[in-house]
């Protein structure tokens, strides 16, 4: 396949992630939107790695690193959301004013 198809798919994923990040008030949806953004970046890394030099695996190694960081981010983010839900009984981003007394 040509590079432009991968780039178009990655751009579409990135735009969907940005839209979800901007419009969503639910904390879990925000985390899912961030994961979409990271997957768009992974798709770009893999596409450019294959397009520029398919014998080197630098893009694949960096993609595995990004997937690992994304998994850790999701685990920490969900733990924070769960802790806030237990205290506030909501996952609405407007209600996350924890710095107020």
Curated annotation (Swiss-Prot):
UniProt membrane topology term: Multi-pass membrane protein
EC category: translocase
Record GO biological process: ATP synthesis coupled electron transport; photosynthesis, light reaction
A matching Pfam family: Oxidored_q2
Residues that span the membrane, as ranges: 3-23, 30-50, 64-84
Localization terms from the record: Cellular thylakoid membrane
Cellular component aspect of the GO annotation: NADH dehydrogenase complex; plasma membrane-derived thylakoid membrane
Assigned EC number: 7.1.1.-
UniProt xrefs under InterPro entries: NADH_UbQ_OxRdtase_chain4L/K, NUOK/Mnh_C1-like
UniProt keywords, alphabetically: Membrane, NAD, NADP, Plastoquinone, Quinone, Thylakoid, Translocase, Transmembrane, Transmembrane helix, Transport
Superkingdom of the organism of origin: Bacteria
Any one GO molecular function term: oxidoreductase activity, acting on NAD(P)H, quinone or similar compound as acceptor
Reactions it catalyzes: a plastoquinone + NADH + (n+1) H(+)(in) = a plastoquinol + NAD(+) + n H(+)(out); a plastoquinone + NADPH + (n+1) H(+)(in) = a plastoquinol + NADP(+) + n H(+)(out)
Keyword Transmembrane recorded: yes
Quaternary structure note: NDH-1 can be composed of about 15 different subunits; different subcomplexes with different compositions have been identified which probably have different functions.
Homology family: Belongs to the complex I subunit 4L family.
Function noted in UniProt: NDH-1 shuttles electrons from an unknown electron donor, via FMN and iron-sulfur (Fe-S) centers, to quinones in the respiratory and/or the photosynthetic chain. The immediate electron acceptor for the enzyme in this species is believed to be plastoquinone. Couples the redox reaction to proton translocation, and thus conserves the redox energy in a proton gradient. Cyanobacterial NDH-1 also plays a role in inorganic carbon-concentration.
Name the record gives this protein: NAD(P)H-quinone oxidoreductase subunit 4L
Organism: Nostoc sp. (strain PCC 7120 / SAG 25.82 / UTEX 2576)
């Amino acid at each position: 396949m040509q590079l432009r198809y991968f780039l178009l798919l990655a751009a579409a994923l990135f735009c969907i992630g940005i839209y979800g990040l901007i419009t969503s008030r639910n904390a879990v949806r925000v985390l899912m939107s961030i994961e979409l953004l990271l997957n768009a970046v992974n798709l770009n890394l893999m596409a450019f790695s294959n397009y520029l030099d398919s014998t080197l695996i630098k893009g694949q190694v960096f993609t595995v690193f990004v997937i690992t960081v994304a998994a850790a981010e999701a685990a920490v983010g969900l733990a924070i959301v769960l802790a806030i839900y237990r205290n506030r009984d909501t996952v609405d981003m407007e209600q996350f004013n924890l710095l107020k007394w």
